[in-house]
């Protein structure tokens, strides 16, 4: 349980005089945004349970910071994606829920088609828009956030994204180019709680942390994931 786990962690930190924490949060805390790109001080109004738990965890850190002096950085990930360039480390979820691995399961022969959940959203092609950020860029941000706290930085929140949205259909087309293979698509109904678009403004992280994403081309991001999947066709079970 996210919330209970955070309670136990924060209590242990206070008890053992650990006064800094870098937290992996999520863009899901925003829910359906009133504007894009999203800024860190925009309203948070989650539309799913996951986002609500992360927002609650952020609030818990805020109160512990005030009461006990624990300083925190909350990194609000947008859509984490990709793998190490050499294909040694990648995504392995059971069941898989992330879009890029699900798309790549089709050219891998693990599924017959990818389902697109809804094509009637208020976006250019009717499918959801998301901002994809490579895992290496996320790792870089974590190191910078820790350095920021070690240098005395105050508690803070940062968005982590590339600042550009790609639709589900665009991601499928990019995957076709990255893999050189056709990908069959079937349409499905909308999923409850899916915002039409989530696109970050990460200017604050760039200015305050000095963060500079290295993977800004979505086809390149998908390409790193494809390399991992080709080397691990049965995931880490092989």
Protein language model regions, located:
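Catalytic helix-loop patch of NAD(P)-dependent Rossmann-fold dehydrogenases
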Residues: 3-8, 14-15, 19-20, 28-79, ...
């Amino acid at each position: 349980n996210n919330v209970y786990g955070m309670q136990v962690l924060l209590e242990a930190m206070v008890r053992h005089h650990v006064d800094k924490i870098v937290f992996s949060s999520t863009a899901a805390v925003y829910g359906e945004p009133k504007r894009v790109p999203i800024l860190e001080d925009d309203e948070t109004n989650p539309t799913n349970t996951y986002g609500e738990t992360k927002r609650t965890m952020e609030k818990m850190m805020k109160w512990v910071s005030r009461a006990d002096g624990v300083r925190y950085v909350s990194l609000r990930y947008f859509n984490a994606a990709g793998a190490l360039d050499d294909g040694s480390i990648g995504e392995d979820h059971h069941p898989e829920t992330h879009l890029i691995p699900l798309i790549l399961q089709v050219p891998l022969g693990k599924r017959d088609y990818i389902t697109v959940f809804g094509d009637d959203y208020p976006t250019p092609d009717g499918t959801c828009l998301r901002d994809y950020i490579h895992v290496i860029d996320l790792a870089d941000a974590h190191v910078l956030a820790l350095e920021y706290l070690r240098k005395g930085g105050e508690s803070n929140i940062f968005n982590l994204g590339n600042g550009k949205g790609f639709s589900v259909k665009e991601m499928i087309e990019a995957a076709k180019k990255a893999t050189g293979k056709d990908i069959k698509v079937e349409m499905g109904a909308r999923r409850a709680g899916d915002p039409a678009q989530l696109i970050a403004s990460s200017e604050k992280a760039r200015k305050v942390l000095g963060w500079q994403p290295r993977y800004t081309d979505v086809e390149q991001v998908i390409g790193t994931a494809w390399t991992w999947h080709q080397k691990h066709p049965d995931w880490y079970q092989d």
